[in-house]
Amino acid sequence: VEIGYSNLTMAAVAERAGTTKTALYRRWSSKAELVHEAAFPTAPTALSMPEGDIATDIRAMIAAAGAVFTSPVVRAALPGVIADMAADPELSQRVMSRFTGLFDIVRDRLVHAVDRGEVHPDIDPDRLIEVIGGANLLRMLLVPGWEIDDQWIDQTTAIVVHGVIR
């Protein structure tokens, strides 16, 4: 956060941590992986709450993603991490694998909503994940200093829910 992603080096991290670059590379294969783990020490668990109706679940997903994207560490790191991920598909796969459990929960919730008749059966769970993450990411990138608020969450939820409900 202090110097920005583009100015961060593994050597600087090693020096500040009192270790060696070799030790860092044993744990993280790249700066992007190290920064990603620092920004996301654990995968977000927005859906640890009991399953509700799909509108409530979608609102919780949007709010949780917004809280993650507006944290100072993520705000500083994410543009650089995304650039590195775009240039390295293997890195992208490793980084995104940390979210597999969360994405599986979203998929399960959508399947259950289809089974309850709340959601169109042709809604692709992966598109829902992309829309929620993408809306938050774009807002964070386009509006520097943006802080998530209930009005934005409610409006975004209404738009997304309108697209998935029966």
What are the roles of these predicted feature ranges?
Residues 33, 38-39, 69-96:
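Amphipathic alpha-helical segments used for helix-helix packing
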Residues 1-18:
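Short, amphipathic alpha-helix enriched in basic
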Residues 27-29, 137-138:
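Tryptophan-centric aromatic hotspots in well-structured domains and transmembrane helices
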Residues 92, 96, 100, 114-159:
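Hydrophobic/aromatic-rich alpha-helical bundle segments in the mid-to-C-terminal region
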Residues 7, 30-35, 45-46, 58:
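Short amphipathic alpha-helical segment with a characteristic S/N-K-E followed by hydrophobic residues
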Residues 109, 159-166:
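C-terminal alpha-helix
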Residues 46-78, 128:
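Hydrophobic alpha-helical connector segments
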Residues 17-28:
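Short hydrophobic/aromatic patch on the recognition helix
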